[in-house]
Swiss-Prot record:
Name recorded for this polypeptide: Actin cytoskeleton-regulatory complex protein PAN1
Regions of compositional bias (Acidic residues) in chain numbering: 1023-1032, 1068-1077, 1180-1192
Bias-annotated ranges (Basic and acidic residues): 867-876, 921-984, 1038-1067, 1101-1112, 1218-1230, 1420-1430
Disordered as annotated region, ranges: 1-67, 234-285, 297-428, 564-629, 861-1440
Gene Ontology MF annotations: actin binding; calcium ion binding
Protein keywords: Actin-binding, Cell membrane, Coiled coil, Cytoplasm, Cytoskeleton, Endocytosis, Endosome, Membrane, Repeat
Originating species: Meyerozyma guilliermondii (strain ATCC 6260 / CBS 566 / DSM 6381 / JCM 1539 / NBRC 10279 / NRRL Y-324) (Yeast)
Example GO BP: endocytosis
Residue ranges the record marks as coiled coil: 627-686, 1024-1076
Family stated for the protein in its record: Belongs to the PAN1 family.
Compositional bias (Polar residues): 1-21, 245-257, 297-384, 399-423, 573-583, 985-994, 1080-1100
A Pfam family hit: DUF1720
Subunit structure, as described in the record: Component of the PAN1 actin cytoskeleton-regulatory complex.
EF-hand domain segment(s): 150-185, 513-548
Amino acid sequence: MYNPYQQPSYGAPQQPQQTGYGFNATGGNAMPQSQFQSTGYYQQQPTYQQPGFQPQQTGFQPQATGYSVPQTSYQTGFQVQQTGFQPQQTGFQQQSAETNTELKIPNIRLSFITASDQSKFEHLFRTAVRKGETAISGDAARDILLRSGLPPVTLAEIWSLSDTNKSGSLLFPEFALSLHLCNLALKSEPLPSVLPEKWSNEVQSFVDAISFSVPEDPSKILANTPFASLGTEEKTSWMDAPAAPSTSFQPQLTGFQPPQMPAQRTGGQITAQRTGGGSLIPLQPQQTAGLVPAGLQRQNTGYQPPQPLQSQNTGFQSSVGRQNTGYQPPLQQQGTGYQPLKQQNTGYQPPLQQQGTGYQPPLQQQGTGYQPPLQQQGTGYQPLQSQGTGFQSQGTIQPQGTGFQPQSTGFQPQPTGLSSQPTGKPGQWGFVSTPTGGIPGLSAMEQHFLPNTQLSSNNLQNAMGGSLKTNVTWAITKQEKSIYDGIFQAWDKSRQGFIDGETAIGIFGKSGLARPDLETIWNLADGDNKGKLNKDEFSVAMHLVYRRLNGFDLPLRLPPELIPPSKKHIQESMDSLKNSLRGGNNKPKRTQTSSSLYKHDDDDVGYVSTARHRKKSDSSSGSGSGTMSIEQLKKEIREKKILLDAMDSEDRDSSVLSQRDREWNEREIESLKFRILQAHNKLESSGISGSHEEKVQLLDRLRHLTQDKMPKLISNIHVVNNEICSRQMKVAKLRLQKEHPDWAPEASDADIVGTGPNGEVTDYDRKKFKSKQLLKRRMAALSGAKTGSTDTAVDDQLAKATEDAKNLGDQQRKMIEEISGSIKDLEDGCISALQSTTREDSYEKWEKGQGVSSDVAAFIRSLPKSEGSKNGRNEKTQSPYTQPTKSQSQSAQSTQSQSQSTQSVQTQPAQPATYSSYSSPEDRAAYIKAQAEKRMNERLAKLGITRRKETGSKAPEVPKEPVEAPKPQEIETPKETETQRETNTKSTSQTSKAEPQKVSVPPAIPSSSQAPAIPSPAIPPAPEDDSEDEEYAALMKQKQEMEERRLRKKKEKEERLARLKREMEEMNKEEDSDEEPVTSVPTYTNGSVKSSTQPISQSEEVPKTEEEKSGESEQTASKPEATPTEQAPKPDLVSTSAQSKANPFSKNNNPFFKPTQTPTIDPKKAAAQRDSQRGLGSDDWSDSDDNSSDDDGPNRAGAARLASMLFGGMAPPPRAPTIEKEETGSKETAEVPPPTEVAPPPVPAAPPASVPPPISAASSKETDSDDEWGTPSAEAANDHDDFDFGNNFEPSMAPSPPPVPTQHIPEPVTDVPPIPQSIPPPPQSFAATVEDAPPPPPIPSQVPPPPPPPPSLFPTESSNAPPAPPPPPPPSAPSAVPPPPPMAPAAPPSAPAPSPGGPPGGAPNIGALLGQITGGKSLKKVDDSQKRIADGATVGRVVD
């Protein structure tokens, strides 16, 4: 068949083709493969030749253009004609079973594939694609790709790159791309991970071109047309035809004709058709398969349209006037159509008979003879209007001299009388015939709109302007589309697929149209208002420009023919999706139906709701239920029973499954509860879960200290430091003036009076001062007066002193800044540890059970929260590091200064502890404060500043792990064990007591009455009668003494540490040898915290045996010359451990006080006492300091204060030097024999007459006393937070109490006030201020009575101990006043004056104080190694 849109080049090799139907003798349909071309009906006969026909050369190669019937005996037609073209295949001849000649592939070149490769790929593609399909299936493509021998992984990558649409099949451009990638892989070239943009754009354009060229279904074309009935009758013909036509022409037998056309008369009437494209559009050659010539791509059909065809004789050229081009006379009649066609005679018959050349049933028979005035006839089943197929005198071909009327051979344009119309639906581009006559200027438009052309718009308008055609539609033809696409690709150089608005305006502006027209065109093209145009939208705009240049009016709306297919497809998809969603979610309203109403055909729509069928089935079942028979009803009943049984079975199964699920869920819940409980217990045991409120309180307290209090302190320190510098410079100047009376110092910068803000010296002040000095010198030079100093040495000394003072001030300032930085670091660390990471709502939800279900809340409340806190309390009760509660901490602030002065022995923790090792918030807070204080004191130590507190030689005490106390029965030991322990202790003490004699003792510090106190950095004002040089000498001497004392303390610290290590080893050996279980290893803890694990009761009766009393008397009598220093620390060494106090037979190294019963403990009182013992101040900071240089020596001021409190009513101790006291004590202590251990006698009942002195006075004095457990005085409270720049207290040692006599108990003193029947309650809180304390009692004028037994003073209500024994008898009157300390049982001396270290309120009640000391449960036992007196490190300290 000839396609008018295919134009091959001359000499191009073409494949043979056959475009007609071949009939055999029986009328059957056959498609043989012929190698030659025949121009009419002929049969090949090897023996018979027609004499009148000679072959002629027409420049074309032979080509079969009609129905060729293979015969083996004769030929009746024409001779073979050479047409100049090689045989070619046009898609209508099946050369082999594998080649799909019907497949239409656009003639588009892929730039990345060579032309030869693309032709090979196309041939391979045609052989693999079945007829009726346009894409190769995945299986077929897989088989082809596997032939390359590549691994499957590589082929899978190639497939993913080639299948651009992800459809599972490949169109030709995708198939060619896959083969090209295979070639690259075979050449060992790497495959691209993503297709290059150029390749992707070309392949996508090729795919779009194939999608646009898909023909329409003939059934859809015939729908709603008068030819619909004819189309349905010939469905078999459509099925039998090689391909479906889409033009208005039927196959003709006399020329190159499209398939599926009914045969025409082959005699004298040949329908003219357009076969070469005419003079309209020169088309490029291309191969198609069974598609129409009007709107399809061009194909090579053999003839070249530009070459004018010469007329040729197609009949007999002899004398025969006319010939039959059908069958020759010797042949029998045959059917030239399908089987139902009637036979016709094709021999020589002057009056030729009519023969059917088309489809017989619908067509009327036509005469094949000579009929000049032939009428137009319908040539096939088509939706188009009929066209004239008779003789039309047109074209350039000369009429043939065959006896027939001249006719066109089909190579000229169609008659202009036919109206061109689109053959597809509106909006489907490329299926529109070019308007007859054409619209001019298309080629000029293509050249005008290219990017590099600079042509005037007048040239373009002159090329346009053809006469308006009324039969021209808005549809875009293939030729126009190709031109528009070429312009688009020329402008879209980056291959983005879009042209922006600016570029489009420049392109459209070349047309010379008015601005309103261009705006209208843009609005019509860019319907989505994107601001840019894709290829289809650009084609629409260019088409509108083209039509407007030809005089057409622009439409107000975009015609349906111009709607881009891509946009239409997207819109249709969106509409269908919306309809499906609307129909699926929203049920249509039920409308009243009636049989009289018009019913829509459901087959017309693509989506049919299932609700319609459901409605029909419901109505049918409802209507038929009334007419069901009995058998049907029984059947329904049986079916319903079966359904009910099935439902019951399902219910049972579901119930079983649900029961299993419930059981499984319950097990899971229990398992989770158990895991939660384990985690909770783990958290409680580790102590990680601190209270949120406690953390908030501690954090607030920390911020108050660091943000409010600390900045003020630092500011005050800076002020004092500046004042010290200025005073030092003034003192140096005055000293030099006194030493050199004739020396007149020159005014220095310090004499400049500043006039700036805050008295600052400005530049103006300096200039003014210099000018004054210069003027003064000049005046002195004129008058000869003396202007300044002539002694340069003195000036140098002054400058040096001034510089030293400034340097010292700078150093102090830097130290303060370092301390401030350390405080900031400590603050950050504390804040990070105290900041709560738990949200408040989460805490309320998971800790208190708020906002959760009742079951979860009940489980949360059932968690053992109290157990963790109870364990924490027990641990804190047993731990020697117990921290006070908030109220106790506040109450203990007022007693810190007293405890600082009385506690001096500090021990070292056995193991280093960390923050995470403490289980309670109090312990962690204590650890944080201990670390903070340690760092603070490190900074303060550099300045020589120490806070007024107890001194020690170890690091700040931190809490340690609690130690469980053994049971009472484990503590009780027989007397033999106790005796053995005493023996071991004596030997150890003798060894340890001899050691201090070898240790160098620092020189005695002058007492407060003999030596001035160590001055602070601020130099005190000198007395008026003292000279300046004496003040300076005293200052330098004090400074030198301070430095020497620091060196001594450092050396003493090292020696003391070594001695303590030795003592520790000895004690460990001693305790290892004991059979009694030891409750805790003696450790050196901070003196600010007691080491007891049990609370301390307010009173405890500790009676002494007669043997002990006699031993004490002997010991005292043998040492009449003993100094008070020997026995001063004994009240402090009375302490015993809690376990020993609970055991009446436990060993105690103190011969004075041995417990005989287990007292009742009051936790609140014990906590208050521990607070005071720890030395907690008002700011909750501990007083322990490891690196303070002033902590190395003994707190002699504390010892003096303790001695004054204990023995204020006795004779004042002698002012002996400390060295002598220590030496004497050392010697005398070594000579003291150990007391004999005697079993204690039974406790007698306390007689009512034996009453101690009144307690009221003691309790009143206790408020103002300076003891360890009492409320501090006003001076002590005020001195609590002060910084001490030296030990300013008198280092006098406190005397020990007199021993209890062993004689008979005398009659009670009659003038003693009666004792109250009930003991007044001890103070529950130590927060009482000094104002609340009662006034001190007057100094007694008579000799005070002997102290009663302390245990009888503080019995508790819950105490189950036996009544207290009677007090010991008073000693007999001595012959003379005993030497101090009065230890003999003589009459008490006269009332002495209060000692300087005593409290301002007078002598305290010694009995009450001794009762509290002996009642302390936290005092541990002390071996002989620590009972020595000469050691300065333990003087006046309470041993923990």
